[in-house]
Each structure stands twice: as C-alpha cells, then as structure tokens.
C-alpha cells in the first residue's frame, strides 16, 4: 500500500478518523444528556434534526468559502471551531431551562454547519493528491478507517456516557477535533489547483448539474432508494424484528449489528485488495451488489434461525461497502473537477435530511404491517436500484474514458 507513504493521504486519513470518532461521541453524549434531563425521545431526536438542517444550509456556501479561504484554512479552522462549539454546548446543556435547551440546539447547528465542509472537501481533494489509478484503493482505505472509528464510536459511546464522567467524554472529543485540525495543517496541496475544484457558478447551476449529469443523477436516485431500504436496519426496527419475529433477546439484536459492521470492514479490505478488478468493473459491481443485498435482506426476513440472520447481516456488509466505494470513485471521475465540491455538497443536502425521513417512513411501515413486512419492502427497494442500474448502460458499462470533461 505504497500510496499510504504519501504524507497528504495519511494526513487526510488521520484527520477524517479523528473527526469521525469525535463526531459520534458528541452526538451520543448530547442525546443521552438531553434525554436524561427531559425524559423525551422527541427532544433528544432534535439533535439529529438540527444537524440535518445545518448540512442543508452549509451546502449553499461550501464552494465559495473553500474557494476564497482555501482548503487548509477552512478544514483546519472548521475542526477547531467544532472544538469551541463543543465547549459551548457542554456549558449550555448542563443548565436547566427552556432557554438553555434552545441555545444548546443553536450551538449544535453551528457545530454541524462547520462539520459539513469536511466531506465535500475531502471528496474533491482526494483526486488531487492521489493518482487516478489509485482512486478505488484510496477510497477503500478511507472507508475502512471510517468504519473502524465509527464502529468504535457507536460501540463505546453508549458505555462511556454511563461509565465515564460527562466532562471527560467532552474533553476527549475536543482533543480529537484539535488533532484532526492539526493533521490538516500538515497537508501540502497547491491551493490554486485545489481552488479550481470549487465551482464559481451559481447555486442554481450546481443543482442543475446534479440533475443533468446522467451517472450523478442515477447514483443520487439509487442512494435515496437505498437509504430508505437501509433504514430497516435501524436499531428500533431491528430490535422489533428480533423480538416479534425471531422471539429472541437483545443479545441477538447486538450480534446482528456487530455482524454487519464486521462485514463492512471486510468489504473495505476486499475493495483495497482487489482494487484493480473493481476499477475495471465499477458499474457491474454497483449493480450486482444491489441484487445481492436484496437477496440477503429476503433471506434475513424469512429465516427462522437467528444464526442464519447474523450470517446474512455479515454477508451484506462487504457488498454494501464495495458498492459505496465504487460509487464514490465513479463520481470523482465523472464530475468535472471544478464542480466536485458544489455537486457533492448539493447531493449531501438531499441525502442528509432524506435519511432522517426514511426512519419515520419505515417505522410507520413496521408499526402498521409488522417488522417482517418492512424488511420485505426493503428487499423490493434494493431490487429497484438494481433495475435502475440495469436500465442505464452508461453506468453498467462504465469505463474511465467516459469521464465528463
């Protein structure tokens, strides 16, 4: 993995890992704290809602801010700002009263607004610091690192909120964001070249490009369908399936979650190991993964044996990761260089709030028809993404020479 000796790649990887872990810890500790203070699931859930609103708002100014201030200043500064907002959130959330609650949500909005700059910028920076032939491998390594740190964050976050004082968890998150910003500060990029990836066109033009570049449009639609399908794997629906359909305890519920994350990590390793194969067959990998995920979801929904369900979860992880890595690589290649940041910010502005809505939709399906029907509906949605890919020859038969100029 020679490209990891590239200091720029390593710095970007380190920065993302630190900020991913810190972001998860902050989300968990805030939601738990607010729930303990208010005894309201709705009020605790407003944390995620305000984070989504911030992502939408940030999508309209990511490109101009990065173009004017430069990548390093914005990314390093954003991480340091997030550390400051954690301090402010920690102060306000420890005070009772409606006013302090809304002040906390305001700080949550600012915290997430600053964080919304990272992913579009990282998406645009990677093709600048990595040769094209290493896109799949680089995306695979970053995805693997992200999965490991997210797994650690969600796995340990709940435990830490109960076993470790609130102030220590907050302090750890602050340190992680400072380290993330410090990692970005050692990044060496040509700011003029990087600024060329920040679109100077109007917001309307960026959203128009999102809809008229065929592969970008198709992948966005597929992502929306797969987000709706994937919401059945949320903790609440999966727990209901475990209890009502399998008649098992929370132990198996935890095993299903763990199995998927293990599979996702394996998927990233597979994408790295066989990157040259996936580079030649990205379209087929995306299409085939959707088909297999549909089959595995059906297997999960109809299997009466918990062990087989756990195997289905583990098997789904690699296909999901390979598809995700191939999609990101394909987007990096087909989106014109100067439009990468704007288009990805617009795409995230669609998918972030949509992801929140999907949990409500599938939750209603599970309440009305049962958890098993919700999983069968998810399998049907995966089939729809397979059919969309199958109906788009330019996506299925994608070759690098198809890149939009």
Curated annotation (Swiss-Prot):
Transmembrane segment boundaries: 9-29, 41-61, 74-94, 98-118, 138-158, 168-190, 227-247, 252-272, 291-311, 373-393
Protein name: Uncharacterized MFS-type transporter YjbB
GO biological process: response to antibiotic
Major site of localization recorded for this protein: membrane
Keywords carried by this UniProt record: Cell membrane, Membrane, Transmembrane, Transmembrane helix, Transport
GO-annotated cellular components: plasma membrane
Family: Belongs to the major facilitator superfamily. Drug:H(+) antiporter-3 (DHA3) (TC 2.A.1.21) family.
UniProt membrane topology term: Multi-pass membrane protein
Gene Ontology MF terms: efflux transmembrane transporter activity
Gene that produces this protein: yjbB
Localisation: Cell membrane
InterPro entries: MFS, MFS_trans_sf
């Amino acid at each position: 993995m020679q490209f990891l000796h590239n200091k720029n790649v390593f710095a970007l990887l380190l920065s993302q890992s630190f900020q991913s872990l810190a972001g998860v810890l902050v989300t968990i500790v805030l939601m738990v704290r607010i729930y303990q203070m208010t005894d309201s699931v709705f009020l605790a859930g407003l944390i995620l809602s305000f984070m989504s609103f911030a992502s939408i708002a940030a999508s309209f100014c990511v490109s101009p801010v990065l173009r004017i201030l430069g990548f390093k200043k914005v990314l390093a500064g954003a991480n340091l700002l997030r550390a400051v907002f954690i301090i402010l959130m920690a102060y306000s959330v420890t005070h009772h009263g409606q006013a302090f609650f809304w002040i906390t949500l305001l700080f949550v909005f600012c915290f997430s607004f600053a964080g919304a700059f990272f992913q579009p910028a990282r998406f645009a920076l990677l093709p600048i610091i990595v040769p094209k032939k290493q896109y799949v491998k680089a995306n695979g390594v970053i995805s693997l690192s992200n999965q490991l740190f997210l797994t650690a964050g969600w796995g340990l976050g709940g435990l830490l909120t109960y076993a470790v004082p609130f102030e220590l968890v907050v302090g750890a998150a602050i340190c992680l964001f400072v380290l993330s910003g410090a990692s970005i500060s050692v990044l060496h990029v040509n700011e003029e070249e990087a600024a060329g990836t920040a679109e100077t066109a109007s917001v309307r033009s960026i959203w128009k490009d999102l809809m008229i570049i065929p592969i970008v449009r198709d992948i966005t639609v597929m992502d929306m369908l797969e987000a709706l399908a994937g919401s059945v794997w949320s903790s609440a629906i999966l727990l209901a399936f475990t209890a009502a359909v399998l008649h098992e305890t929370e132990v198996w519920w935890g095993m299903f979650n763990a199995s998927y994350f293990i599979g996702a990590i394996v998927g990233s390793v597979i994408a790295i190991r066989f990157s040259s194969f996936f580079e030649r067959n990205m379209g087929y990998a995306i299409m085939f993964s959707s088909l297999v995920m549909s089959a595995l979801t059906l297997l999960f929904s109809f299997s009466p044996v918990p062990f087989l369900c756990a195997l289905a979860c583990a098997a789904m992880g690699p296909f999901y990761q390979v598809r995700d890595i191939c999609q990101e690589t394909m987007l990096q290649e087909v989106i014109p260089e100067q439009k990468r940041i704007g288009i990805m910010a617009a795409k995230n502005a669609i998918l972030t709030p949509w992801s929140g809505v999907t949990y409500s939709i599938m939750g209603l399906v599970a309440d009305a028809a049962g958890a098993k029907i919700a999983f069968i509906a998810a399998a049907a949605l995966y089939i729809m993404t397979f059919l969309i890919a199958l109906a788009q020859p330019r996506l299925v038969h994608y070759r690098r020479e198809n890149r939009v100029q």
